[in-house]
């Protein structure tokens, strides 16, 4: 089960690299830093070793926000929900909560990619 989760996270990260997601928390040309994305909605949260995966998720939602496919309220609510789940995981780490956190984050990543794909022609087939 643990190998399957790791494979899923690795697959999501590889996919993130293919769709133009920054590979550093510092951002890049046209991509705000992870801290800047978090500050759009409040105080930054320390995601520890999950920071890059969370950043990829936030960045895809940010692209949808910038292209008018997502409201700022929904973007900030999305960030808040992820922060809340991460806090619950960090408060009580263990195999079950790690699995629940990984599954939740993968679901959120898929949602963010869906929002981005709706407004970003580089993610559409064809």
Please tell me what each predicted stretch does.
Residues 1-8:
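Bacterial N-terminal signal peptides that target proteins for export
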Residues 14-17:
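C-terminal motif of bacterial Sec signal peptides marking the signal peptidase cleavage site
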Residues 31, 48-56, 69-76:
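Soluble non-cytosolic domains of exported or imported proteins
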Residues 26-52:
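Post-signal peptide N-terminal segment of mature Sec-exported envelope proteins
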Residues 66-126:
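Compact alpha-helical subdomains of small soluble proteins
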Residues 19-22:
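Bacterial signal peptide processing site
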Residues 59-63:
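Amphipathic alpha-helical segments within well-ordered protein domains
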């Amino acid at each position: 089960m643990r190998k399957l989760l790791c494979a899923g996270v690795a697959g999501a990260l590889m996919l993130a690299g293919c769709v133009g997601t920054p590979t550093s928390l510092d951002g890049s040309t046209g991509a705000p830093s992870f801290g800047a994305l978090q500050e759009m909605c409040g105080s930054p949260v320390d995601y520890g070793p999950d920071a890059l995966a969370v950043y990829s998720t936030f960045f895809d939602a940010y692209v949808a926000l910038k292209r008018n496919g997502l409201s700022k309220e929904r973007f900030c609510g999305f960030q808040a929900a992820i922060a809340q789940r991460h806090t619950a995981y960090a408060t009580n780490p263990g195999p079950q909560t790690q699995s629940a956190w990984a599954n939740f984050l993968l679901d959120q990543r898929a949602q963010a990619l869906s929002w981005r794909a709706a407004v970003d022609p580089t993610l559409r087939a064809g």
